[in-house]
Amino acid sequence: MSLPGLELSQTSSEREFVPAPPTQITLSKGSEWRFEVAFGTAIRVKLLAGTAELFGTELAASQTYTFSGTKAAIYTWHGCTLEVSAGDTISTIDGLGSGGLNGEGARGYGAGGCQSEYTAEETPMVEYANVHFALEAMRQEAKATGKDGPRVLILGPENAGKTSVAKILTAYATKVGRQPIVVNLDPAEGMLSVPGTLTATAFRTMMNVEEGWGSSPMSGPSAVPVKLPLVYFYPLQNPLEAEGAVYRPIVSRLALSVTGRMAEDEDTRETGIIVDTPGILSAGKPGSLEIINHIVTEFASSERLYSTMMKNYDNKPTSSASAAASDERITVVKLSKSGGCVDRDAAFMKSVRESQIRTYFFGNPIPSTASAALSMSASSTTNITLSPHAQQLDFDSLAVYNYTIASSDEDEDEYDPSQFGASDTFLPGGRNDAEGPETKHAEETSFTSSVPGLGGSSGDDAASGSSAVPLKKVLPPAPNTLANSLLAVTHTAPNASPAEIRDASIMGFLYVADVDSEKGKIRVLAPIGGRVPPRAIVWGKKWPGEVVGLVG
């Protein structure tokens, strides 16, 4: 009923979104369906007939999978029929979808609301499968002779599909019962962790179709077995920062941990390692080849990169500081770039990072009918909701460290009014009277890596050099720029040396929701309850940087 003259019965200009009817897509043998879904929107995909896989992981028949903020492809070896429909609107950190649009505005005109979708007949999947079979032959030989399995290093420019190839090779390996160790050396994206981390994970089970690599342990049920990543924090976007002086020692420490795992686990030793690298290392920038050489030494596409790799490494003996010398030879193989590789702009990558951080603290907001079916839940859909614990901490009680490396692409202003007292401006050189000789001595002392056997023969290795580790303790009062950023809690003591803090693995992450400089307190979110462990904490100021809107 409507009141005369008020026109209350008229429909609102913001009409409720009405999804289009489901669309059936038939794929012929050896073809794939490529699709892009914006953040804030979702599509549902169901396999009606035949067989299909997403980055090597098979889709279960008659199960509905939900995708959001994804650029992916579903491939079929023998032909299949897919049903694609529109999903619910997914809330993001800022309430907006990709490109500043809300859920409905970001929907495209493709099947199910995809921004882009099409079927491709020509794919490089046969090449990738041949690589898998070649690796399997090497693994069988390693098992028969007692040697280490193949160590695969994937190199290529940005947006070339390196991570997709790593997923495919990992999925195929687990499908035949292998247990590869996957190493992510790209701090731009997290693997089973937040951005700004270098991780290594032993994959014993299948990967999650909807979540990519899968999920790390959490206090709740999981349809797919969780993975246990070893995490190191590298709070810089570019591995070439400070000429790799921070990146290389962390890579060495990660390689040492991986080598130790392989020495104790026969299954992973026979299967080998798959290493995914940052695309910037293949851009030909100064220092890139030195870091690639360091990665090859520790762990083991353009024409110029391919030629350089062939010249420097093809059929050369392996030389690893963390592994025993052998007569193994390095083989360089060039793979075709998939036509489905698309550029990911800065806005999309920002949404990817925010989504990974939000998922770490609050769980996956995407409702999944496939997960509900696999977990035999009573509900038709399910999504993993986590409840982080909020608490206030005295900043004086924390040992927070920050990397003091000037950004290579911007002149960052380090000024923060809360860091200065009323009379600090008038002291010689801006020095604080509270800083005694001990503080000055600690800042000027050089620390070197104490890891035996790592980088001992490389003169340019920062771990063995005499230069100081660029880690500085953040002194009270708490800087206002600490708000909306991540803190990495390490496994080392709060008074450890900068080299030990740099080389320490990560226990977990805190999100700083608010800073009260006057009271000397900060409000943080923690993934678990209880007191924050008394450990050294590294501030992710430069990377992943500020994440606004995670909490209200």
Swiss-Prot record:
It comes from the Eukaryota. GO terms for biological process: mRNA 3'-end processing; tRNA splicing, via endonucleolytic cleavage and ligation. It is found in: Nucleus. Residues 459-468 have a biased composition (Low complexity). Its main location: nucleus. The keyword Nucleus applies. GO terms for cellular component: mRNA cleavage factor complex; nucleus. Pfam families: Clp1 (PF06807), CLP1_N (PF16573), CLP1_P (PF16575). One of its GO terms (molecular function) is ATP binding. Belongs to the Clp1 family. Clp1 subfamily. Required for endonucleolytic cleavage during polyadenylation-dependent pre-mRNA 3'-end formation. Component of a pre-mRNA cleavage factor complex. Interacts directly with PCF11. This is mRNA cleavage and polyadenylation factor clp1. The gene is clp1.
